[in-house]
Amino acid sequence: AFDRFVPSDWEAVAFPLVAALITQSEITVDNIDNSGSQGDSAIVDVLKSLGGNITNDTEKNSLTVRKSRLSTAHLPGGELHVNLSGYPDAICALAVAGCFTEGTIVMEDIGVCRKKETDRIEVMQAELRRLGAEVESGGDWISVHGHSPVLEDGSRNPEFVLHGGTVESYDDHRVAMSLACLGLGLPSGESVTVKNAECCAVSLPDFYAVMNKNKARFSW
């Protein structure tokens, strides 16, 4: 017999991180893999570059997100260009984060995303637009121009126009989880209904239940 640390799947960790950031909440994720062996861990650096208040406790293998306002205003050209060739599965979570970021995020070198469970570039563009987001795309890129729900002084941002609605998951687990998380960040009275949301079971069968233990408001 032997003891072995079983690390978290960074592709799964992305969703609670983004959910906390877009709702200006705090969450701690335990059992984090700090070995650098998973390319998707780079999403933390991307979120930090947007102003995400994220700390990594390497001794406890935990990651904590605190209340943050996401923006690209401090970046060159006022935009974030990120090459996702090493972790293309992050497209769904980052696209949702982009909807709540003051500025523009351009995700590049993601042509492979057109050959996943769905064409994730086309699908995310279509469903985010359905909810009021400004999204453009090309053969191997997608851009999201968003607005923070709050201004720098903490007051409500009148330019934040995302709204609720019914969206398709296309039986793609990452699409379903990302769009469900988007709904958490909408103003009171607005909600998102994801069709066939249970398709997330292919990778995270307890996703909604675990999120609800951390004060999400999912019903299914």
Kindly give the residue locations of the regions a language model identified:
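Short, structured segments at the rim of ligand-binding sites
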Residues: 1-220
